[in-house]
Amino acid sequence: MTAQTPIHVYSEIGKLKKVLLHRPGKEIENLMPDYLERLLFDDIPFLEDAQKEHDAFAQALRDEGVEVLYLETLAAESLVTPEIREAFIDEYLSEANIRGRATKKAIRELLMSIEDNQELIEKTMAGVQKSELPEIPAAEKGLTDLVESSYPFAIDPMPNLYFTRDPFATIGTGVSLNHMFSETRNRETIYGKYIFTHHPIYGGGKVPMVYDRNETTRIEGGDELVLSKDVLAVGISQRTDAASIEKLLVNIFKQNLGFKKVLAFEFANNRKFMHLDTVFTMVDYDKFTIHPEIEGDLRVYSVTYENEALRIVEEKGDLAELLAANLGVEKVELIRCGGDNLVAAGREQWNDGSNTLTIAPGVVVVYNRNTITNAILESKGLKLIKIHGSELVRGRGGPRCMSMPFEREDI
C-alpha cells in the first residue's frame, strides 16, 4: 500500500491490517415491532448490550494488531468545508422520502443546527421521529403535511449500518460503491460516497470506483469476495442480480486492478441465504466454510474478459476441485456449518455460523454461540477468536458482515 492507494485488499485471508466498523447507535432504538420488515430486521437488539458486544469485537481485532476505523468518524471527517457539509445534508434529505415540504424544511433546520460533524452524521443514521420536530404553523403546511399519518418517523432510521460489509466493498485497490437491494439500505451508501469523494485520506480520486451507487441494478458487499490476487467470487443472490455483476466485472477488468477471473455463484434466492458470505467464507489457504443446504442447487460460472467482452462458462463437477484449481492449491476442504446434522446446520447458519471473518490465514473471528461449527473448525486446526453476539446476531449478520477490510497483507 502507498499513499496513492489507501485501499489494499487482495484476499479474504491475508493478515488484516485495517478495518472499518460501525458501532451500533441510536438507530437501533428506533426499531419497533410494527415496522421490522420495512427496516429488514427480525427482532430488536438491546442497544446497551449490542454496543458492549460490538466494543468487545473491536477490541478483539485490536488485540490481534488490527487498526479499527469507524464509519461515523470517517464520514464526519469527510465534511471538510461548510459547502460540502451543506451538500451532504441536502443530498441526505433528497433521498429520505420525506412527505411534506414544511416537514422537510423543519428537518433541514434541525440538521443545520447541529454544529459537530460526528453528531450530525450520527443523527442522520438514527433517523428523525415526527415528535422531535416543532409544530408547523397551519399556514405553512402543504396538503401532505396536513394529511396525518400514524407512521412515527419523518425519516427512517438506518439500523443495518453496523453491517459495514454491504454498502460498499473494497476490491484490490478499488471500491464498489453499491446500489443496494432495498430503499432502506440504499440510503446507507451516501456515507461511502462522501468518504471516497472528500475524505483527506480516502477521497480525491485516490481510490478507483468500480461500481456506482447511481446504477439501477442491485449489488451488495456480502456477495463480493476476494479469493486471491487473481480470482474474485461473487454471489447471485436475493440481494445481488446478474446484471450488476456484469457491470462490476467489466469495470474491474477495464481498470486493470489485477484480477483475471471471477467465479459467480448462483444459489437460492431467499432471506435465509441473503448473501454469499452467509453461506460461504474462506478461512485458510485451502479451507472454506459452507452451508450444506446450498450445495445441491449451487451453480458456478467462470467469467473472464477477452477482446473487450466478458466470456462466461458454466462450471461442472466438484466445487472443491474447482476452487483448488483456481487458487493453485492441491486440495480444498469445504467445512460444513453444523456438520452433517441438518438441524444444527440450519440453526447455526441462521446464527451466522458460516459468516466468519478471517484476520490471518487460519485465524478466524466467530460467534461463540455456534458451538458445533466452532468445534469442527477447531478440529481442522483453525485458531478461533470467539466473540459474544446474542444481540448483534438479531440483525442477521456475523463477523464478516460487521467488517469492511481496508488493508490486508498480500499472501
From Swiss-Prot:
A GO cellular component annotation in the UniProt record: cytoplasm
GO biological process: arginine catabolic process to ornithine; arginine deiminase pathway
One Pfam family, short name: ADI
EC number of the protein: 3.5.3.6
Pathway: Amino-acid degradation; L-arginine degradation via ADI pathway; carbamoyl phosphate from L-arginine: step 1/2
Chief location of this protein within or outside the cell: cytoplasm
A molecular function (GO) term: arginine deiminase activity
Family under the similarity heading: Belongs to the arginine deiminase family.
Protein name: Arginine deiminase
Species per Swiss-Prot/TrEMBL record: Streptococcus equi subsp. zooepidemicus (strain MGCS10565)
The gene coding this protein: arcA
